[in-house]
Amino acid sequence: MYMYWGWGEEPTMKTITLGSTGITTPQDAFGALPIQRISTDEAVRLLHRAYEGGMTFFDTARAYSDSEEKVGIAFEGMRDRVTIATKSGAKDPESLASDLETSLALLKTDHVDIYQFHCADRVYRPGDGTGMYEAMQEFKRQGKIGHIAITAHKIGVAEDAVASGLYETLQFPLSYLATPREEALVEACAKANMGFIAMKGLAGGLLHNSRACMAYMTKFDNVVPIWGVQKKSELDEWLSYMDQGTPALDEETLAFIASERAELTGNFCRGCGYCMPCPMHIAINQCARMSLMLRRAPSQAWLSEHWQAEMAKVDSCVECGLCMTRCPYELPIPQLLKANRADYLRVLAGEVSVG
């Protein structure tokens, strides 16, 4: 399905129905994690610009500091015009209920459209003894939430959530670097009439070709990507596809994606940060992928005194393994840190050129 802005005009942006929720939205949505890093005035202007540009789906979370508050201020008085999804990482029903009440107050609303278990490490079910799913059912009965949903980073948890038939949407990382297993997860959601909300569409900042990222998402008729935005220039890039039309996944784009996959497959850090904090204060989510950042972004910023000091902390790693127990991608983080540190030193010494 496509959106039409006027009689006789060409179709512009593909629209998606999120499974059994019945929620329809352009396949171009707003991830509100980054707005916690900007002022309230800046965030509200950005959110208004997103809405005026055609975005109607906004995803936030209790864990994103003041993101919910900013979303609430932006859409007060126009709640029925937007879809709001939020999340809680609570581990017991009482905390889950408290989080929901806080979210509702900050969002200035009496309900959220989609309420998600945040970064779940298990799939809650009725009768499992936790009371978590029953709490969600009660929230829904009270009209405080529209749909029960889940977000995950571990594919085994995501697959279990789909198979359970208990959730109306799944939020999971998806980009054109996806593995066959991850793409099969999207198809499983489609067969289960379950909406798929795609996070990490830029693979944690490693991908820079927005047109290719957007075109890849059009492969799927059940996927809504949420793009993390904190700058007007970033937003305008995504909004441009509302006017220009959904980019085609043509031969040129497919060839580009193939070249990117060849470079970036394997054990690379996505920068999600779930491994942190580190007992030795290492910025793992950047240090473990520094070699990629040096080569895929302007390198000068990563060679600053600040990042030289941060990379030096890698030498203090005691290989306690705590980070590996937290990593949803089961990466060998201490080895990645050492390899990136060694490469960084070679770059600093001028032995390796990164352009």
Question: Which sequence ranges carry the predicted segments?
Answer:
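Conserved, mostly hydrophobic/aromatic
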Residues: 18, 30, 58, 71, ...
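Structured C-terminal cap/extension of enzyme domains
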Residues: 51, 55-56, 184-198, 202-355
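Alpha-helix-loop-beta-strand connector modules within alpha/beta enzyme cores
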Residues: 69-86, 134-142, 191-193
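Generic structural signal for well-ordered alpha-helices
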Residues: 13-15, 47, 68, 72, ...
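Short hydrophobic/aromatic-enriched beta-strand-loop microsegments
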Residues: 81-84, 167-175, 246-252
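Short catalytic-loop micro-motif centered on adjacent basic/acidic residues
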Residues: 56-61, 85-86, 146-149, 169-172, ...
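Glycine/proline-rich, positively charged
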Residues: 38-41, 52, 91-197, 202-205
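N-terminal binding-site loop/beta-alpha segment at the start of enzyme catalytic domains
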Residues: 2-82
